[in-house]
Amino acid sequence: MFDLLTIPRSMRLASPGRSRLRRWTFRLTSLFAIAGLVVVGYRWWTQPRPTPPTEIFRGVIYTCIELSEPECRGLLHLVKIDLNAPGIQLYMTRTDPEAVAHGYQYRLETAPAVLEREHLALVVNAAYFTSDSGVLQWSGDWARGVQTIVADGQVSHIDPHSYLLWFESDLTPHLEFEKPPKAAVLRQARWGIGGGAVPLWKGKLREAAAGHEMDRRTAVAIDTGRRLLWVAVFENASSTAVAQVLAEQGAKDGFLLDGGHSTTMVLSPQAAHVQSGSLIHEWRPVATFLGIRAESLQ
């Protein structure tokens, strides 16, 4: 009778339990590999690509530009809104009554949720904020805004350090180059959003208000005379480069909003001729949003 120890390892029979374990291990490994390939393929297929100026809603033109300058790299998603176009409406986050009752102003939300609920053509993150969140931020967490927000005539608070980009009831845009904004301006403003510095003024870069640190950026700019609004998100840019790029696009006055991990732009599924959905978005909920409603081309 053979001693099991004398039988070569290659001739020994594997136990049924061990064989099943190996088969299941192989199947699971294959399944995860296939799932990984699907995810990578989907992300490649759906990732934004450079796009020439394209009207996606009535009066709303989207452009995607790939930049490779020293202080501006990656994709720029730029939306120009003609405030003269029929059907254009603005959206700004209003203070939440329940949050106010608890000593806060807002509840954190994600951009896709706001886009769907408010029936927006596009949405971007707005002002800086603080929240009662711990290590992770979740939708529904209490939050306070840093800069002033005017939402349908409702003023969130007066931040003494905020410049104000604001709109009259007919959507004529202005940038108040005095902080805090005067009471008369706040009475006129139907919509408004505060910013901490103005790197673009009268079509030129203000170097004293701009820096060279690179990060994800969200910015807004206007041309009062032509009644135009630009909303832009940059994958990686300095505030100096942001101001220069917006000036090259024809904007006259503008500033940065919250950026970094807050940077978000989402387009509605009704956007014509371009890929919709999240162009830059990390699913981080934020406190306030700037949105646009517009008539569909479809």
Predicted regions and their residues:
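Conserved beta-alpha junction segments in alpha/beta enzyme cores
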Residues: 67, 76-78, 192-223
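Zymogen propeptides
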Residues: 12-15, 22-156
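N-terminal intrinsically disordered, acidic low-complexity segments at the extreme N-terminus
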Residues: 1-9
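Short acidic-glycine loop/turn motifs at beta-strand connectors
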Residues: 82-85, 131-132, 166-172, 202, ...
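Conserved, well-ordered active-site substructure
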Residues: 136-157, 206-257, 262-298
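Active-site-adjacent helix-turn-beta-strand microarchitecture at beta-sheet edges
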Residues: 129-204
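General beta-strand structural signal in soluble alpha/beta enzymes
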Residues: 122-126, 175, 254-258
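Short, solvent-exposed aromatic-acidic interface loops
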Residues: 94-99, 179-184, 233-238
